[in-house]
């Protein structure tokens, strides 16, 4: 089908939705929510289409001036300059923006996200690094006015985290954080190291889209739920009631333990939320592999075994190995969560890969 017809169809659809939303009393709550979502998704695309249409009209008008034998010489020359800039420079730029805007969206991009961090190789130093990463993402969430809600933290007693998870709520959380999944490596001299020897440790980060029960249902028969008394560092009991919950998904043998809340009901709800996100992510990855068999994405795999970034403290340097980007602002990134330098490039690179795959 002609691309021009597609663009005009989109404009007509947008205008139709706009008219509908002008009289919300005629809509059910579900219709209003769905139309509002579609309207907000279409609005940036329509803005580019309007820009494209305006530019094409301006180019045609300039063509008329250039062809008109009655046009004065100076006006013709100015028109030729403007025509060249708009035809050869601006139009290709707007076309590229339009092509990108029309690419199929990742349906999970608008979702909230569950952050999971696990200490890897490196013992206590790895646990301290995991805690540092957890705080870094918390700072980044604050910078973007997202809500950062810790779900579960398994600490080592001296400030490190063996495991930690959090729910992050806000606008396009998953879209911006999904490329953070993978192995993060740190190189630094531990405070306890008397010889000053450089240690290398690692932590694994997983970013999972949050899914509601209506979006992804888990069969009750596939679950085993055990309750017990919660324990603190070293195994000592910190609760006199059976509030800790262990949920096992029998088909996959996946286990989620939640004991941070005093209420068994709240712990169960949180554990099920994490389990649902993990199972959904497995299905999502299967679909992504099917979609990308024809093209090998360098940054979009989200493979948790892939080493994606190294934090070198002696040189105050952070390197993202997927995009060969190095920053010497380690302090600001770690302590203030200034991650956008990396995230923006990762998003742009992914968009370029998707465009190449469509062409």
Swiss-Prot record:
Q: What is its main location?
A: cytoplasm
One term of GO molecular function: translation release factor activity, codon specific
Q: Where in the cell is it found?
A: Cytoplasm
UniProt KW keywords: Cytoplasm, Methylation, Protein biosynthesis
Question: Which superkingdom?
Answer: Bacteria
- What post-translational changes are documented for it? Methylated by PrmC. Methylation increases the termination efficiency of RF1.
Q: Which SMART domains match?
A: PCRF (SM00937)
User: Into which family does the record put it?
Assistant: Belongs to the prokaryotic/mitochondrial release factor family.
Record-given protein name? Peptide chain release factor 1
Origin species, per record, is: Wolbachia sp. subsp. Brugia malayi (strain TRS)
């Amino acid at each position: 089908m002609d691309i021009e017809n597609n663009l005009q169809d989109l404009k007509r659809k947008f205008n139709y939705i706009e008219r509908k939303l002008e009289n919300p009393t005629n809509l059910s709550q579900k219709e209003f929510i769905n139309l509002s979502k579609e309207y907000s998704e279409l609005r940036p695309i329509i803005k580019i289409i309007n820009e494209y249409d305006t530019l094409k009209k301006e180019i045609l008008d300039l063509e008329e001036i250039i062809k008109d034998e009655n046009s004065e010489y100076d006006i013709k020359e100015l028109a030729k300059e403007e025509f060249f800039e708009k035809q050869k420079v601006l139009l290709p730029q707007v076309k590229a923006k339009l092509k990108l805007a029309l690419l199929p969206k990742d349906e999970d991009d608008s979702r909230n996200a569950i952050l999971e961090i696990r200490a890897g190789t490196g013992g206590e130093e790895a646990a301290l690094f995991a805690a540092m990463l957890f705080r870094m993402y918390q700072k980044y969430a604050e910078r973007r006015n997202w809500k950062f809600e810790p779900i579960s933290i398994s600490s080592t007693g001296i400030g490190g985290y063996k495991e930690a998870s959090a729910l992050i709520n806000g606008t396009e959380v998953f879209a911006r954080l999904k490329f953070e999944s993978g192995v993060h490596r740190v190189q630094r001299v531990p405070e306890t190291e008397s010889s000053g020897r450089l240690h290398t440790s690692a932590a694994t980060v997983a970013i999972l889209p949050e899914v509601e029960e209506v979006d992804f249902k888990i069969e009750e028969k596939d679950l085993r739920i055990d309750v017990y008394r919660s324990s603190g560092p070293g195994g000592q009991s910190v609760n006199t009631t059976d509030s800790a919950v262990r949920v096992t998904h029998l088909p996959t043998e996946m286990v989620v333990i939640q004991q941070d809340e005093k209420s068994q009901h709240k712990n169960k709800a949180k554990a099920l939320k994490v389990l649902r996100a993990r199972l959904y992510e497995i299905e999502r990855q299967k679909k992504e592999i099917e979609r990308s068999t024809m093209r090998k994405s360098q940054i979009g795999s989200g493979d948790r075994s892939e080493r994606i970034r190294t934090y070198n403290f002696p040189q105050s340097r952070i390197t993202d190995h997927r995009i060969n980007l190095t920053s010497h602002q380690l302090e600001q990134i770690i302590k203030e969560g200034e991650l956008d330098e990396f995230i923006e490039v990762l998003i742009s690179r992914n968009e370029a890969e998707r465009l190449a795959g469509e062409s």
